[in-house]
Amino acid sequence: MSQTDILYACVSYKGVCLVEHKIANGNFIDLARRLITKIPPTSKKIYTSENHNFHYISENDLAFLCLCHEKLGVQIPSEFLSDIRQQFIRSYGQSFSQNSPTATYDPFIRVLEERMKYYSNPKSNKMNLVMDQVSEAKGALTDAIEKTIHRGEKIEIIVDKTERLQSESFVFKSNSVALKRKLWWQNKKLAIAIGLVVCILIAVITLALLKYFKVI
């Protein structure tokens, strides 16, 4: 038994112990059983006794408690309690009866034993910390890559729109030049036609006047 061991863990409902596991004997078991009768329906606290800490969390009268040396700190016991809480609710739900047979929850003793060993192993704790840091860094990197790709897609959309506008502008300019030339030629032909009509009218009027004055 070392100072990194979780010595005792239990799950209780309304002050009644449903399941527990220990790796050592001592008066701490009686102390833990008295303590669970005083845990508020919803709470999170640390109770200290002779260099050891009782850590507990409770919600809706369902409490999870563990005992360990004070040198183990706060983070690891807190993670342990959150872990067994999730597994217990996953296994048994959130509705309980104080009259349920004690044996109902006996299979969870193996879960407590396994998780106590896991969180009591310093190497596992350090590995968990490293893995969490790696996972966090990986998540941040993934988010950064996704944002970069998203920005890249926006840039590509802007470039495509710019190229399309340039193309449309060129087509519009070409069409404008062609239309201008067409209108110029139509105006030219109209001017020529008007000129011819005017010349013909002048010729007709001139001939009429000459005949009137009997010049011809």
From Swiss-Prot:
It holds the Pfam family Longin. It comes from the Eukaryota. Keywords: Coiled coil, Cytoplasmic vesicle, Endoplasmic reticulum, Endosome, Golgi apparatus, Lysosome, Membrane, Protein transport, Signal-anchor, Transmembrane, Transmembrane helix, Transport. It is found in: Cytoplasmic vesicle, Secretory vesicle membrane; Golgi apparatus, trans-Golgi network membrane; Late endosome membrane; Lysosome membrane. It is a single-pass type IV membrane protein. Its main location: membrane. Residues 211-216 are vesicular. Belongs to the synaptobrevin family. Component of the SNARE complex composed of syn7A, syn8A, vamp7A and vti1A. Involved in the targeting and/or fusion of transport vesicles to their target membrane during transport of proteins from the early endosome to the lysosome. Required for heterotypic fusion of late endosomes with lysosomes and homotypic lysosomal fusion. Required for calcium regulated lysosomal exocytosis. PANTHER family: SNARE PROTEINS, VESICLE-ASSOCIATED MEMBRANE PROTEIN 7A. This is Vesicle-associated membrane protein 7A. It comes from Dictyostelium discoideum (Social amoeba).
